[in-house]
Every structure is written in structure tokens, then in C-alpha cells.
From Swiss-Prot:
Topological domains annotated Cytoplasmic: 1-94
Membrane topology: Single-pass type IV membrane protein
Lineage start: Eukaryota, Metazoa, Chordata, Craniata, Vertebrata
Name of protein: BET1 homolog
Gene encoding the protein: BET1
Modification Phosphoserine occurs at: S50
PANTHER family to which the protein is assigned, alphabetical: GOLGI SNARE BET1-RELATED
């Protein structure tokens, strides 16, 4: 951006009647330097923030991959258990299934009771 009369036509070292023009020019330069430094610090802050976000994203992606593998193994385990329960329920062992369910409920009730007393 050019400003009229700020340092134009003044030979170097000759401040004669144009001293005010040089001081205005240097004031603009100082302001530009100050604004440039402010902008540089803001850009540096944004850069460091984006680097930190990148590290956090990598960490979260690693955590999600681990959770995915754990969910897959749990799904397989539950699938096998449900398959065994289906086989057990299809057979003539309904009395055994009933006892197993009652035992499970009893164990869960005892665990609930112990936790509740704490």
C-alpha cells in the first residue's frame, strides 16, 4: 500500500524539509514490523496446535484399532457361547438349562448384594 508523500523524492541522508516524511515512513515500517511479528507468533501457535492435534489423532486411531480387535474377539466368544446355548436348548436337557440359568441368577444376585453392602 502506497501512501502519498511518505519518503518519496528524498535523497538518502538529506533530511532538510522532509524530516517529517521520513519519520512517517519509519512509523509505518515499525507498525508493519510489529504486525508482522504478531502474525508470525500467531502462525507459530496455530502450527504447534495443529501438530498436537495430529499426535492426538494418531493416538486415538491406535486406541480405536485396539478396541476393534477386542470387540472382534468378544463377538467371537459370545457367538460361541450362544451357539452352545442353542445346542443345549435344542436337546432334551432343558432341566440342566433351567438349573444353569437359576445358578447364574443366584451368582449375579450374590455379587450385587456384596457390592451393595460396600
Amino acid at each position: 500500500m502506497r501512501r502519498a508523500g511518505l519518503g518519496e523524492g528524498v535523497p538518502p541522508g538529506n533530511y532538510g524539509n522532509y524530516g517529517y516524511a521520513n519519520s512517517g515512513y519509519s512509523a509505518c515500517e515499525e507498525e508493519n514490523e510489529r504486525l508482522t511479528e504478531s502474525l508470525r507468533s500467531k502462525v507459530t501457535a496455530i502450527k504447534s496446535l495443529s501438530i498436537e492435534i495430529g499426535h492426538e489423532v494418531k493416538t486415538q486411531n491406535k486406541l480405536l484399532a485396539e478396541m476393534d480387535s477386542q470387540f472382534d474377539s468378544t463377538t467371537g466368544f459370545l457367538g460361541k457361547t450362544m451357539g452352545k446355548l442353542k445346542i443345549l436348548s435344542r436337546g432334551s436337557q432343558t432341566k440342566l438349562l433351567c438349573y444353569m440359568m437359576l445358578f447364574s441368577l443366584f451368582v449375579f444376585f450374590i455379587i450385587y448384594w456384596i457390592i451393595k453392602l460396600r
